[in-house]
């Protein structure tokens, strides 16, 4: 056996082990959603869908899911606006403290979630904010802005300045240049940044614990049910459905974008 072939096989085995490490627990949870018993034991004693209806019609789960979707959507919207605006400002203009501002923009995602959560909680209490949807959105936006900013600023750095200059030389105004040149170039970065921001917000637990007050988002509801050992079959169903739904935006993003990283406008 040649060294090249041995290396290829070794790398293949290593990749298979890594993928198994990442996805086998997810597959097991998905199988537990069809477990006829309310006790999580392996192997499962058959397949059933009897837990799906109770899980879907659970009012506490529905309320938590709706709150998570609203918070994630609003946090993503805030992140897209602020993150893209910040990336344009940092990339296009030269000013004193530019690198420091860039560092401060990406710092929140590097901080431990418990630090961010405690800081936000103290701030909200000091200013007598009512804990609820908007405090959750503010908390999630602190790290969602980072992923949008990183994606967009990285794409802007790879975008040749000559494209914008050529557009202006051909008589296009600022809006036309943005619409036909800049936006198609950064569209995939916005899509990927928005999807990642939504995913991070949707499954956030630590920061949400400090900013949600008495309300439960879906991850907090799941954590509470697992910690108390209640409704585990329904929790497994909810986890399975969430995993299934998350495939949709990823597939749409792949369909709407192209390998070149440029979104077609025609």
Language model features: what each stretch is:
Residues 62, 66, 70-82, 86, ...:
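Hydrophobic alpha-helical transmembrane segments of multipass integral membrane proteins
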Residues 3-7, 37, 52-60, 208-259:
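Interhelical loop and adjacent transmembrane-helix boundary motif
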Residues 1-8, 73-105, 118, 122, ...:
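Transmembrane-helix boundary motif in ABC transporter permease subunits
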Residues 24-59, 211-213, 266:
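Short membrane-interfacial helix/loop motifs at transmembrane-helix boundaries
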Residues 39-44, 49, 98, 114-143, ...:
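Membrane-interfacial helix termini and adjacent extracytoplasmic/periplasmic loops
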Residues 29-40, 148, 189-223:
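Non-cytoplasmic
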Residues 2-14, 153-164, 168, 174-183, ...:
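C-terminal transmembrane helix and the adjacent membrane-cytosol boundary/short C-terminal tail
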Residues 13-14, 19-26, 117, 149-152, ...:
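Transmembrane alpha-helices
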């Amino acid at each position: 056996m040649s060294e090249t072939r041995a290396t290829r096989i070794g790398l293949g085995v290593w990749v298979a082990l890594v993928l198994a490490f990442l996805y086998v627990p997810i597959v097991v949870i998905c199988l537990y959603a069809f477990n006829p018993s309310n006790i999580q034991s392996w192997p499962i004693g058959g397949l059933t869908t009897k837990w799906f209806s109770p899980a879907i019609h659970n009012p506490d789960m529905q309320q938590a899911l709706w709150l998570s979707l609203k918070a994630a959507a609003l946090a993503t919207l805030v992140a897209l606006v602020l993150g893209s605006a910040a990336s344009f400002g940092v990339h296009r203009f030269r000013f004193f403290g530019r690198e420091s501002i860039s560092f401060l923009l990406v710092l929140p995602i590097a901080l431990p979630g418990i630090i961010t959560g405690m800081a936000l909680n103290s701030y909200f209490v000091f200013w007598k904010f009512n804990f609820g949807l908007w405090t959750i959105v503010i908390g999630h936006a602190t790290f969602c802005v980072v992923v949008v900013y990183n994606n967009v600023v990285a794409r802007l750095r790879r975008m040749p300045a000559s494209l914008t200059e050529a557009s202006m030389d051909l008589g296009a105004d600022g809006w036309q240049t943005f619409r036909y040149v800049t936006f198609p170039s950064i569209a995939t970065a916005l899509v990927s940044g928005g999807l990642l921001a939504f995913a991070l917000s949707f499954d956030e637990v630590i920061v949400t614990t400090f900013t949600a007050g008495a309300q439960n988002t879906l991850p907090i509801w799941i954590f509470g049910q697992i910690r108390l050992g209640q409704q585990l079959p329904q929790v497994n169903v909810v986890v399975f459905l969430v995993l299934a739904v998350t495939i949709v935006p990823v597939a749409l993003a792949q369909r709407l974008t192209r390998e070149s990283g440029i979104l077609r406008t025609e």
